[in-house]
Amino acid sequence: MSSGPARALTYPLLVTSGTLAVVAAWVPFADIDQLSALAVVGLAVLAYTAYRGGLAFGVFPTGLVATGAVRGRRVRQQYRLVSRSWLEISSGDRMVWQPVFYEPALSTLTPTDLELTGRSIHDGNTRFYPSGRVRTTEPTGKLVDNPSRPADPPAFGIARRLILDLQPAVGAPLVGLLWVYVMNGGLGAFIGATTVAAATFTWLSAIRGSDPS
């Protein structure tokens, strides 16, 4: 089974596009200060998405220095509202944790020999795409192991993933209130700031490699 970027990266890129669409939708109604804020948000989303994409495709180093065949397994991190997939990689007496974008093959991955090239991570024909830099210490929170026996990969729809990634957006109204207070805006400014903040929080969860499992 081959895993291309279409499967692992489609969801975060769709959320990125949706976030930029929300930002663009408020441009016609923005005054000069609001327009400047929207421009900053839009540029930040584009820049950070490009950086994460660079990590995923090996353009930027993730800090994973081992090469060749190494022992690895998948663990799922659960910390507060954060859920991410990590590859726990053993190389000699050293262990590191590499975050990766979720794809269904991760849910059934049993301890195996991973092939590292310095720019990519493979399990046979399946490629895993890094969603951040490697850690040399165990990720914070609860780490859940995969089942010891492989099963059919689960299917998680976009709706489920959006619902999970929307959880951090509960703080968006506070951003809206702060914007109204600082900029002396009205109801329209509050609604605009709240929706942009909610979209941005959702995007940040997705682009950091959220795990719907």
Q: PLM features: what roles do these ranges have?
A:
Residues 62-82:
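Structural detector for short beta-strands of small beta-barrel domains
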Residues 104-155:
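A membrane-cytosol interface segment of integral membrane proteins
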Residues 80-101:
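OB-fold (S1/OB) nucleic-acid-binding surfaces
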Residues 1-61, 157-213:
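Alpha-helical transmembrane spans
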Residues 69-71, 97, 113:
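Well-ordered beta-strand positions in beta-sheet-rich domains
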